[in-house]
Amino acid sequence: MEKENRGITLIALVITIIILLILAGISISALTNQGLFKNAKTAQKETEKAEAEQGQRLNEYEDEINKYLENEDENTKAFKEKVGKVLSTTDNTELKDAKNNKIVVPAGFKIINGATTVDKGIVIEDVTETATKGSQFVWIPVGTITKADGTSTTITLGRYDFNSTTGKESTYSGSFVEEDSNDSSTLKKYGNTIAKSITNFKNSVVQNGGYYIGRYEARTATARSAKDNALTQITEKGTENVYNYVTQLQAAELSQNMYTIDKFTSDLMNSYAWDTAIVFIQKCGTNNKYSRQNSLNTALLQTGTNSLTDTSKIDVQCNIYDMASNIEEWTTETSSFSSNPCVDRGGYYNRSGIYTSSRYPSLTSDSYDGIGFRPLLYL
């Protein structure tokens, strides 16, 4: 539930009311204390005294406002001082954004210029790993956050259904599952690849207040044209080619091996990560029904909608591109159909009837031009 935070506007309103009350008191006193003309000298002294007291109070209020503004500026300044710098190559670094929201930057990454608050989409970039250098990810905050406009909102990690009319989320009620390697009762063993550890993912999100998803559909330097193309290095660079013609098993392998250092974990998108990202976008982006958005492009874009000059066709929310557009994306979710166990999500350029929150069961062998994937990171 969203609510208004107290801020400068409230302070200004309080000051205005106090000043009006002071002036009203002065006027009443001057007019009613045994007659205006008879007590003119007394009234003048009282007025001068009241004006002095009023001036003192205004100075005090101004000091408080200045302190508030200075603190706000200091938060923004402190955050901006961290932008563009590798904070550590060996450890993850906890930061606060301009509104005092928590962010954790992985070892070897930097925050790039742009958003200074989490609701706008904080972007990090890999600057140390040779194979993946330049890859970008967006922080998905979980919990109660303060937005750039001073209001607050709450994003809860979960698997969701989305109302077809309003876009509002509710607890997922379908039969697809997110298998957990730590819980044998959830294992279907249908042949698709499941997440490394949903338990570890959820615990990390709680501890760190969020997770990262690829800014773009997975990319690769070499354009792909057939399902039997050799697997190549995965990146998250917006200038490279979409990684299509890939099976769910291949997408999981590439995502899970994207990073192998012990400070954070890479994996293929799971249903918690996908659905919670939609909730984040609907609460912080410009489309509160993004869950029902279908593809903005109607032909395959090899470098995604981020490369378009027609801005009306660019699918971007909170610095995240193409969850609703271009190609469908594999996840680690498992369908209820043993013959079609893989689940892909998101919009597809060739099908107007599917959208961001769509879930589709697919074969483990499915691989075509309109299917790709997106990696995630958690700490």
Predicted feature descriptions by range:
Residues 146-155, 220-225, 352-355:
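Short, solvent-exposed loop/turn elements at domain surfaces
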Residues 60-83, 288-301:
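Short, glycine/small-hydrophobic-rich surface segments
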Residues 28, 143-146, 217-220, 332-338, ...:
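Acidic glycine-/aspartate-rich tracts in secreted/extracellular proteins
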Residues 30-54:
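Aliphatic-rich helix starts adjacent to a transmembrane/signal segment
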